[in-house]
């Protein structure tokens, strides 16, 4: 499967039909052939979700922590043949969700006692830059297993330790890391459209050997960890940008899991 078959174009995202057997998560990514640099992960996140939804016949999609910035508008979701339900723990964030989208308020790492919880109610669950803020990620994965229908798929996209840039964010006091991020990215100031939340990085790693046993304990029949290296935090710092890029290119070439910067962690629930 080429990325052309997963393309979202212009104001009208569209998934072009492909005639392929269901296959496995690994074979899906083998055919897509992601680049090593994390820019690919950012650029192709929506297309990857649509590709997975198409390949595995997934229609009812829950976006975890999507409150203020949902994956698609209602029109985009409809055009791509999916029913999008936006989840968040915070009612204030859900109040910012686009018009027409369904919402579900519950804590993905909680006890799933909230009225909006629908066990086995989703064909797919996705999240982008959420899991690094979750306290209790292993429980979150167990809950995802409960919330997915048989054969359902989940994808979590998050930053990973111990990439130096995120290791620094992890060890610095929150007040200091806030100040650094606000200086580099003014749009992420408090009250803006993309505020910075405290990051815990629980189970946010890019090492398949570390993650897969935990995901199997959560009950998943199939797992895939797509690793990425590189980032854009030094783009406005000539010299440092080039050194960092060379470091990450080398790490990607040798497959150094310890310093991945981002990962797509993708799981599939058994059909039984």
How would you name each of these model-derived features?
Residues 2-120, 124, 260-263, 271:
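Conserved N-terminal segment of class I S-adenosyl-L-methionine
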Residues 32-36, 128, 196-202:
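Surface-exposed cleft-lining segments at the edges of enzyme active sites
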Residues 72-74, 96, 136-137, 145, ...:
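Short glycine-/acidic-enriched loop or helix-start segments at secondary-structure transitions
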Residues 108-110, 132, 163:
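Active-site micro-motifs of SAM-dependent methyltransferase domains
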Residues 124-136:
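A short SAM/SAH-binding and catalytic strip from SAM-dependent methyltransferases
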Residues 134-135, 148-150:
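Helix-to-beta-strand junctions that scaffold the AdoMet/dcAdoMet cofactor pocket
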Residues 138-139, 143, 153-265:
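S-adenosyl-L-methionine-dependent methyltransferase catalytic module, highlighting the catalytic core
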